[in-house]
């Protein structure tokens, strides 16, 4: 019996379950493709932005870094660094206290990082839901198919293949379709979650490097210290840490 013949023997309720699974599969693939394109764009633009950021760390101009951030708006690193350097430039031009400047810059970096992470995670909840619930939808269709098979046996009084094939087909197709939809969603969710962790590390490292460069804090460990852990009293008012660029 071919697959099309199996589908032809599926009941109305089982068909509705399969249509639901097929629609969820389409939505899942759409989310996967969209996230893949966005993450690839973020990675590529970040690689292009990093040389400009390194140039700034070695004595480049503030305005050059701001312009580089505008040219690479899809880069997660550029988004965070731009938020910090724009805040720093605004505070510097206003002539505020350097201690307040550090607090404002670190706050801008934290806020931008949080917002960027929210954007990166958008859609992953849907993939997680698909991966965890679709197998149960398929199992539900399986149970319905088996029930229909037993109902056919009870109605005819015999258990021949021609009697139960419709219910069995419904059960098998529902199970297979549920697994088929769930596996890509789970794999994609785990892959994208790993990418987000990598992006988070890159954003945190860039934030720490920016604060270290702007305020000359030698004690700052780029890889180990969160931006939120930087303490304002470490900056000395009027010292080289607040030298105009």
Regions found by a protein language model. Give the residues of each.
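Hydrophobic membrane-targeting segments
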Residues: 1-53
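Internal alpha-helical transmembrane segments of multi-pass membrane proteins, especially GPCRs
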Residues: 8, 12, 18, 122-125, ...
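Alpha-helical transmembrane segments
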Residues: 22-42, 139, 146, 181-196
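Predominantly long cytosolic amphipathic alpha-helical stalk/bundle segments
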Residues: 43-137, 148-160, 187-245
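A cross-family signal for key residues in well-ordered alpha-helices
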Residues: 128, 141, 165
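Hydrophobic alpha-helical transmembrane segments and adjacent short intramembrane/lumenal linkers
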Residues: 157-171
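Hydrophobic alpha-helical transmembrane segments of polytopic membrane proteins
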Residues: 171-185
């Amino acid at each position: 019996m071919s697959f099309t013949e199996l589908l032809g023997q599926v009941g109305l309720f089982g068909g509705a379950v399969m249509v639901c699974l097929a629609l969820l599969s389409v939505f899942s693939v759409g989310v996967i493709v969209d996230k893949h394109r966005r993450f690839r764009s973020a990675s590529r633009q970040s690689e292009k932005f990093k040389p400009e950021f390194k140039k700034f760390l070695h004595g480049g101009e503030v305005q050059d870094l701001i312009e580089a951030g505008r040219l690479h708006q899809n880069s997660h690193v550029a988004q965070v660094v731009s938020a910090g350097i724009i805040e720093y430039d605004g505070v510097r031009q206003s002539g505020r206290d350097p201690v307040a400047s550090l607090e404002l810059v670190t706050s801008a970096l934290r806020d931008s990082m949080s917002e960027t992470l929210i954007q990166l995670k958008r859609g992953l909840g849907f993939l997680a839901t698909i991966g965890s619930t679709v197998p149960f939808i398929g199992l539900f269709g399986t149970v319905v198919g088996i029930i229909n098979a037993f109902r056919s046996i009870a109605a005819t009084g015999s258990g021949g293949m021609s009697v139960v094939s419709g219910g069995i087909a419904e059960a098998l197709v529902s199970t297979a379709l549920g697994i088929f939809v769930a596996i890509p969603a789970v794999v994609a969710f785990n892959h994208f979650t790993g990418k987000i962790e990598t992006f988070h590390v890159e954003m945190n490292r860039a934030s720490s490097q920016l604060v270290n460069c702007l305020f000359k804090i030698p004690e700052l460990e780029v890889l180990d210290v969160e931006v939120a852990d930087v303490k304002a009293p470490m900056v000395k008012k009027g010292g080289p840490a607040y030298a105009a660029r």
